[in-house]
Amino acid sequence: MTKIENCKSCLPTENEVEEEALSGVTFLGRVFKVARCERPVFTYMSIILFLVSYIYSVSRDMKDAIIIERLDPASIPYLKVLVVLPVNICIVFSIQKILINTSVSKVFSIMCVMFGIYFCLYGTVLMSFRHIFELNEFLIRDWFADDKMVFMGLQWTIALALPVNSWTSSLMYLSAEIWGTVVFQFLFFALSNEIYTQKQSLRFIPLFLVFGNVALIVSGFSMKFIKYVSEQGSYEFTLFFRKLVFVLMGICSFVIYLIHRYFEDNIAHKPLFVTSEASYKQKTKSKIGFMEAMQTMASSRLVLAISFVVIAYSVSVNMVEASFKTCMSQYALQKGAQADFHVMGVQSDIQLAVGALSIILLLSSFPALIRDKGFLYVAFVPPIFCIFGMASVFGMAALNNSARGNRTLLGFVSIGENLWLEQLLGAIIVTGFKILKYSAVDVSKEALSMRINPAYRARFKGIYDGVCGKLGKAIGSGITNMQNVFYNSSDVRKAAISSLTIVTVITACWGFAVRYLAGKYDKSTHSNTDIDIDLINVDPMEKDADDL
């Protein structure tokens, strides 16, 4: 007997480890379903995800504050469509090509180092010398002062001009989005799929999301501290403190790299148990281009329905956030507060609420409702919430615009402007959307994914997880941009009635898609077979299946 065979004979089987993980007698044991031998491999990955999520949460709120301070809320949709979407697609597809000959682990390490260098350079160089790198930051605002462009019908172009003039702020917005998409959503979970078996993934992924939401809570308190320090200090001290925040994010990126390298060298590849023949590690990679992804999506009604659900959610969230962020900026001006400080305070409150409530839902029996009650009980919650949420946000925006005398599609009786109430409703609805993202949209989507034949699963997930989320945001931003052009304004709240109409139509289609998916899911579970992917054209998919 060789040394390796002797070592394996001392290891428990995967089923024995699974039984130990599921047999917790204490509260923590029942919540954190992790066997004793799995604790190191789970703990290090949880720490990595915590730091990745913390950087993403802080950078996301910092970028929103910087954009509202130096640019305009109406600039965000243009950045999403013209900058973030194409750059994100290019980076993701480039990484997929690199992964043909390179491991996910190496790419993850490289990205952490690159972002670490970038964050440090941004805090020390770009923020210190942006007056040299950029044109006069007041140049564009002077062009648009005194409503000169309103009479020319070009007021909406300020949202395009400001990101070009203040390009360092646009770069910060782009980098925060790329960190969230590439490092957080793509590479980390691709790395976990290479390390864990399928049974481990089913237990660990919800727990990883818990640690991600703990990071969200910590970042919420961090943003409150940043806001407090910024309000108390002078302009020079506030600028120095913000530089320090970016440098600390860079240091955190390097810490992630060091923890990951130690984990890879000493823990990740040590055998924990004897893997059963029925189990396998999820190493399948989805190597698809954009056009190929669209063609594959169009060949299956099931994938079209799942993709539409993802797109509908992203469009709805994007449109309500555009209105909400504009309202925050307007309310800050109304009460004489500095816009970036005000945004930090509101965003930190949202983070705390989302993190705490998401953890409660993820640790409760809510994710198991699909199994116990049925698919519709979970999947139908987001579109129902969307209808009431959009009616609240856009309805209040329409009333406030009427009170100010701004033209909308329908006339309303002036009842007095109440931006505080509009902001409060917006914060509640945005919080609800983000909570439902973790606890309902993702849970129902993953339940469907687990019923798809493994031969197609990786390719289909590459479509609705890798492409459709950003595509939905781009569509929502495009709708916002077109409405700004139509109303000759940078305030999308003037289009509240048309926004409500568009989202209502999208949500109705969302509901029909959920009902269709529920029927397919229930049929699959009752017959205990793979879900019917409902092919439109069988021959191309049969060929793809043979290739797989």
UniProtKB/Swiss-Prot annotation:
Family matches, as InterPro entries: ADP_ATP_car_bac_type
Highest taxon of the lineage: Eukaryota
GO CC terms in record: plasma membrane
Residues carrying a glycan: 101, 400, 406, 488
Keywords: ATP-binding, Cell membrane, Glycoprotein, Membrane, Nucleotide-binding, Transmembrane, Transmembrane helix, Transport
Disulfide-bonded cysteines: none
Localization of this protein: Cell membrane
Keyword Disulfide bond part of the UniProt annotation: no
Residue stretches spanning the membrane: 39-59, 75-95, 107-127, 149-169, 171-191, 204-224, 239-259, 302-322, 350-370, 374-394, 410-430, 494-514
Key word Cell membrane present: yes
MF terms (GO), sorted A to Z: ATP binding; ATP:ADP antiporter activity
Membrane topology classification: Multi-pass membrane protein
Pfam family of the protein (one): TLC
Protein task: ATP transporter involved in the uptake of ATP from the host cell cytoplasm. Provides the microsporidian cell with host ATP in exchange for ADP. This is an obligate exchange system. This energy acquiring activity is an important component of microsporidian parasitism.
Family, similarity comment: Belongs to the ADP/ATP translocase tlc family.
Name of the protein in question: ADP,ATP carrier protein 1
Organism: Paranosema grylli (Microsporidian parasite)
Name of the encoding gene: ANC1
